[in-house]
Amino acid sequence: MQSLAVTIQGEGPAVLLLHGFPDRSNLWRHQIDALKSDFTVIAPDLRGFGESDRPDDVDAYRVGKSVGDLLAILDELGVEQAHVVGHDFGAAVAWAFALSAPERLERLVVLSVGHPGVPIDFEQREKSWYMLLFQFEEAEELLRRDDWAFLREWVGTHPEPDRVIADLQRPGALTAGLNWYRANRHPRRELDPPREFPRVTAPTLGVWSTGDAYLTEARMTGSAAFVDDWRYERLDGAGHWMQLDKPDEVSALIRTHLC
């Protein structure tokens, strides 16, 4: 198991909060404050991010490996079941958790990213152009060039770009973050036959924000076909990082679904 930095606050039923790229657990600070009065909030820095280990092997960043990390955290804390809330790559991990360890899941909340079985249409492929760029070993050099000018433009809707860049400037951090794309979004996976997924049986809330520059609404709404108990909320006036753009609204949506 990798060494992970984990923030734990509050008492009550356990809730895992899972961030994505290029963030760390403090992305959830507003939601932690809103939930800790009624829940034990567990917010890890996923492997490669924040203060957690940054393994060298690309395959170490497969989402299934992070599911294993989460199960180990719950086992260490003596938690049988938890609610799981994920955003961006954290949402991909949350879906994988629901599919591979349904007996450990109470309720699921996914922000921005829909079920992996939803077909990828042309609009989504256009928005996902950067995933191909990140496969190349020169990507790190391009992103760092001219005081991170390319990255600053790419994360232009992030409310905290300087914090993100400070994180990625640490030794090995940028490569670790890009390895999530190299491990899980490699173009060769387009040639794999369609996967059969078990039904998601946990009550699931999907939230998509109208200002998301990276994910389409159809990717989220299409998740309904794979979930037994599905609820969808469309959040107006927020970008991809809705936890920071609309913290009170996001916290209220999560709390309403979990309570």
Kindly label every feature range from the protein language model.
Residues 251-255, 259:
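Two-component system phosphotransfer/interaction surface
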Residues 4, 14, 49-85, 89-234, ...:
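Flexible "cap/lid" subdomain of the alpha/beta-hydrolase fold that forms the substrate-access gate
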Residues 238-247, 251:
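Catalytic histidine-centered segment of alpha/beta-hydrolase-like enzymes
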Residues 7-56:
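Conserved HGGG/HGGXW glycine-rich cap/lid loop of the alpha/beta-hydrolase fold
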Residues 45, 236-237:
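Conserved acidic residues
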Residues 24-25, 92, 238-239:
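A short, glycine- and basic residue-enriched loop/turn
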